[in-house]
Amino acid sequence: MPPTNNYRISGEPPSTTPSHPPPKPKTRILSLFLVGVIMFSIFFLFLVLIGIASVLILPLLLSSLHRHHRRRRRNRRQESSDGLSSRFVKKLPQFKFSEPSTYTRYESDCVVCFDGFRQGQWCRNLPGCGHVFHRKCVDTWLLKASTCPICRARVRLWEEDPQEGELWRCFGHRRSSLLDL
């Protein structure tokens, strides 16, 4: 084996002092730096996820809130104006009470004023439920509440079968089944 030349490129003989190993990297500084980078990455990812969630959930939350307010407004409006209009009440069927009446077999007294029916008094027969009242009594009642004082059925001017009534309305006709008096 040929002799090895221990001279460096500079041409100087190698030093006789032992060479130092390369310096160790500062692991403490490196680990602190990596921990900082990882924490920043996790925080940034958390912010991105919060942003995505808010973009997806916020519209749902706002629409739900809008529906809730609209429902409350509608309920408040119904509570404040639960009575019928005077125009509507005037269209309800009326008749003059006569003693041999078909209505006397159902009620002998008006349940609004607790007074009996007398000959010649104007009365109303509510369509739908068929209950009979003094005209003045039931008119006052219906201006405040849109239901029958006895059975609480909603007062409607026209009796309709819900499906059949829709069919007649489609053809532009109003099918009346008012009671013949």
Swiss-Prot record:
GO function term, MF aspect, one: zinc ion binding
Protein name per Swiss-Prot or TrEMBL: RING-H2 finger protein ATL56
Main localisation: membrane
Pfam family, one: zf-RING_2
Gene: ATL56
InterPro entries reported in the protein's UniProt record: Znf_RING, Znf_RING/FYVE/PHD
Annotated membrane topology: Single-pass membrane protein
Disulfide linkage: none
GO cellular component terms attached to this protein's record: membrane
